[in-house]
């Protein structure tokens, strides 16, 4: 890449990567191919896919929520309300405030996933207001999954936009028997798709060395959004309305992340995806057998996250474990979690289990 001038002097991916750029030094070609290849993984229509490489998963969530807000306001003439759960990533709460939207907190099921029945109840309470729903596939602490199909069914007949935050799980589920959880396609002929847009982090499952994110939606939905977006601004000097909130964008990351669409990288990702789920199962079994007092849990078989009672500062500090308090019998109890990533080998897990034994 350096020999081609990328990262040698100022490149800029400003604008829509699917439009010709007035700035000759960009990597839009890499960016387009990356979006198309990941669009295939998520089963978007090949002739109706749009997206770009963002600065982070939060940046991708911002574009999804802003697109939803803009489209729904354009259709209904009033701002939507944002629906999400307390298990959603904290960026969703920040973005709700940033976008000036009223939030509707939906209750969760015991596993941490969104409660579809409570969503129905909350939608009925706001029947005349569009709904911008953020579903999480892989919640940050528990690894829970909001059932996208159930949510979409509950939204039937209600003006809505469904954005999926799949920051971690979106990276590996397409390579597992659970790939349908990430698929845009639906067997329901009355629906255009299972969701409207999706955010996936590049620096989580893929191990990309710096924060970046994928944002993918339908080209037709993007065009509806951009028709409203162009009324807000129209920067003539870049020859088109960019369609992104961020203006100047990194050119190095799309060129580097393109590697993850190559056959060898995809094969490695498939191996890694199988491995992390296998090792997560192993860790859970070992903790149930040897440390039942830690109450280790796994939200579902799709998750590579195991959470358990806080084992103490020494373990937490050595392994940089995230911690938080969860309600247990209506009392806050300290918990920690392990996220089993590709670098977490059996040797690492054995050392971790030994440290638990010796604490």
Regions found by a protein language model. Give the residues of each.
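PLP-dependent aminotransferase class I/II
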Residues: 208, 243-259
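Conserved C-terminal alpha-helix-loop-beta "cap" of PLP-dependent enzymes
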Residues: 78, 222, 227-247, 261, ...
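Catalytic cores of large soluble enzymes that bind and process phosphate-bearing ligands
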Residues: 18-30, 56, 84-88, 111-114, ...
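N-terminal entrance/gating region of PLP-dependent enzymes' catalytic architecture
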Residues: 1-48, 335-336
């Amino acid at each position: 890449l350096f020999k081609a001038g990328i990262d040698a002097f100022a490149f800029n991916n400003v604008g829509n990567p699917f439009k010709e750029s007035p700035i000759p030094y960009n990597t839009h070609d890499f960016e387009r191919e990356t979006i198309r290849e990941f669009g295939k993984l998520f089963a978007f229509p090949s002739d109706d896919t749009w997206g770009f490489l963002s600065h982070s998963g939060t940046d991708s969530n911002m574009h999804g929520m802003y697109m939803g807000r803009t489209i729904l306001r354009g259709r209904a003439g009033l701002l939507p309300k944002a629906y999400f759960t307390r298990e959603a990533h904290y960026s969703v709460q920040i973005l709700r405030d940033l976008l000036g939207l009223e939030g509707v907190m939906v209750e969760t099921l015991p596993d941490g996933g969104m409660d579809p029945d409570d969503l129905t109840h909350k939608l009925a309470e706001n029947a005349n207001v569009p709904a911008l729903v953020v579903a999480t596939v892989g919640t940050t602490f528990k690894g829970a999954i909001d059932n996208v199909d159930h949510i979409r069914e509950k939204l039937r007949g209600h003006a809505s936009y469904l954005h999926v935050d799949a920051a971690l799980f979106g990276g590996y589920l397409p390579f597992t028997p659970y790939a349908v959880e990430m698929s845009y396609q639906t067997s329901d002929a009355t629906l255009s798709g299972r969701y409207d847009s999706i955010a996936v982090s590049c620096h989580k499952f893929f191990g990309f060395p710096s924060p970046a994110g994928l944002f993918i939606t339908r080209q037709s939905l993007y065009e509806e959004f951009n028709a409203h977006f162009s009324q807000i601004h129209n920067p003539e000097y870049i020859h088109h309305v960019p369609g992104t909130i961020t203006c100047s964008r990194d050119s190095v990351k799309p060129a580097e992340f393109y590697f993850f669409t190559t056959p060898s990288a995809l094969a490695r990702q498939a191996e890694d995806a199988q491995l992390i789920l296998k090792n997560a199962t192993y860790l859970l079994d070992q903790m149930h057998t040897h440390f039942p007092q830690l109450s280790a849990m796994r939200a579902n078989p799709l998750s590579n996250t195991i959470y358990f009672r806080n084992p103490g500062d020494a373990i937490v500090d050595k392994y940089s474990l995230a911690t938080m308090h969860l309600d247990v019998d209506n009392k806050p109890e300290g918990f920690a979690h392990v996220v089993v990533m590709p670098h977490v080998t059996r040797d690492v897990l054995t050392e971790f289990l030994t440290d638990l034994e010796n604490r």
